[in-house]
UniProtKB/Swiss-Prot annotation:
CDD domains: RecA-like_ClpX
Functional summary from the UniProt entry: ATP-dependent specificity component of the Clp protease. It directs the protease to specific substrates. Can perform chaperone functions in the absence of ClpP.
Keyword presence, Cytoplasm: no
MF annotations from Gene Ontology: ATP binding; ATP hydrolysis activity; ATP-dependent protein folding chaperone; protein dimerization activity; unfolded protein binding; zinc ion binding
Assembly and binders: Component of the ClpX-ClpP complex. Forms a hexameric ring that, in the presence of ATP, binds to fourteen ClpP subunits assembled into a disk-like structure with a central cavity, resembling the structure of eukaryotic proteasomes.
The protein's name in its UniProt record: ATP-dependent Clp protease ATP-binding subunit ClpX
Biological-process GO terms, alphabetical: cell division; proteolysis involved in protein catabolic process
GO-annotated cellular components: HslUV protease complex
Length: 424
């Protein structure tokens, strides 16, 4: 047992670790039968800080995931978009290397390269970010730009993005300062008017201005409990210099701006520029330049802080069919699992899958529209199935997708009686 008193005085207390008396230190903290002084507490903090500094990065020495490894992980869940995957894989790999490089105290400072993902709705921008989050061991958070407003107005401050990152890191400031932030719907904060002096744009240009220093690197004062700041509140200080920002948006209408620029450059009798209807949206977006983003409504300073631009293609019929069946979390597999819980098999013919993909293309909703189409096709069946007996299998073919009949129900009777689609 630790001695609580010295030999010279029964009232004098001593640190159980360094042996200094209460008169030699500023503070002596008492525990069950032990004491620790403020100097030993500070020493322990220094030891822990040094040991964890290298562990703040997800992988240890030599274990940084390669771009190929990151891309292979994305391939398991996201179909197509090879170029965007390469851009993201390299950016995240370099982010890991920057963290390792900084931890070693090298004299060369490596700057970060924030990323802008541009692509049609339903092309996989958000899914890429969500899939990336599963792989990463650094803190990762997603934010919605549509909820942000300029400081002093109703809505969320941009500092709330850093608060979400802190929450993802269990309020470990050191880890949060090395995290990754994905801001979705970034196109919704474009400038609302061509003339910036007409009125105060608190949810457009005002938010862009507020994000500038955050993305470049600043010390943000974050309220631990969230909400608006007030003078009596304590703040956490978070340095955003090493936080990687990835922004994504559909940028509806940007393809027209790009098309106008390309048509203006093509002159002469031999020049040919495909009409907008002849080009897919993704193909047009591939030729996006910073000047197009400026015309769209992003301010020059904001575009300058997103040096890497990755464009996503709109998904064609083959890609949508593959999305339905290939990924680990494919929609067809999900619905087959739901039906399997009822003891019923669910099958789709090849022409049914093609018809579903074509319907999604017609709706111009990309991969996001596939679930709503499947839900509509199977809603009545899922409603009736728990109350029915003897159903062995449900089959969906092209006629079902096109609305000419209901899904075919195969029963377990000897004659394999069919209902639903055969009723005519």
């Amino acid at each position: 047992m630790t001695k609580l008193t010295g030999g010279d005085s029964k009232s004098t207390l001593y640190c159980s670790f360094c042996g200094k008396s209460q008169h030699e230190v500023r503070k002596l903290i008492a525990g069950p039968t032990v004491f620790i002084c403020d100097e030993c507490v500070e020493l322990c903090n220094d030891i822990i800080r040094e040991e964890t500094k290298g562990a703040l990065v997800s992988k240890k020495d030599g274990g940084v995931p390669t771009p190929h490894e990151i891309c292979e992980h994305l391939d398991q869940y996201v179909i197509g978009q090879a170029k965007a995957k390469r851009v993201l894989s390299v950016a995240v790999h370099n982010h890991y290397k920057r963290l390792n490089h900084g931890a070693k105290g090298a004299d060369v400072e490596l700057a970060k390269s924030n990323i802008l993902l541009v692509g049609p709705t339903g092309s996989g921008k958000t899914l890429l970010a969500q899939t990336m989050a599963r792989l990463l061991d650094v803190p990762f958070t997603m934010a919605d730009a549509t909820t942000l407003t300029e400081a002093g107005y109703v809505g969320e401050d941009v500092e709330n993005i850093i608060l979400k990152l802190l929450q993802a890191s269990d309020y470990n400031v050191e880890r949060a300062q090395r995290g990754i932030v994905y801001i979705d719907e970034i196109d919704k904060i474009s400038r609302k008017a061509d003339n910036p002096s007409i009125t105060r744009d608190v949810s457009g240009e005002g938010v862009q201005q507020a994000l500038l220093k955050l993305m470049e690197g600043t010390t943000a004062s974050v309220p631990p409990q969230g909400g608006r700041k007030h003078p009596q509140q304590e703040f956490l200080q978070v340095d955003t210099t090493n936080i990687l920002f990835i922004c994504g948006g559909a940028f509806a209408g940007l393809e027209k701006i790009i098309g106008d620029r390309l048509q203006g450059k093509s002159i002469g009798f031999g020049a040919y520029v495909a009409a907008p209807e002849e080009r897919r949206t993704g193909e047009t977006l591939q030729q996006c330049e910073p000047e197009d983003l400026l015309k769209f409504g992003l301010i020059p300073e904001f575009v300058g802080r997103l040096p890497v631009i990755a464009t996503l293609m709109d998904l064609d019929e083959a890609a949508l069919v593959e999305i339905l069946t290939a990924p680990k979390n494919a929609l067809v597999k999900q619905y087959q699992k739901l039906f399997d819980m009822e003891g019923v098999k669910l099958g789709f013919t090849d022409d049914a899958l093609v018809a579903i993909a074509r319907k999604a293309i017609t709706r111009k909703t990309g991969a996001r529209g596939l679930r709503s189409i499947l839900e509509g096709l199977l809603l009545d069946t899922m409603f009736d199935l728990p109350s029915m007996d003897g159903v062995d299998e449900i089959m969906v073919d092209k006629d079902v997708v096109e609305g000419r009949k209901d899904p075919v129900r195969v029963f377990t009777k000897k004659n394999k009686e069919k209902a639903g689609g055969d009723a005519a």
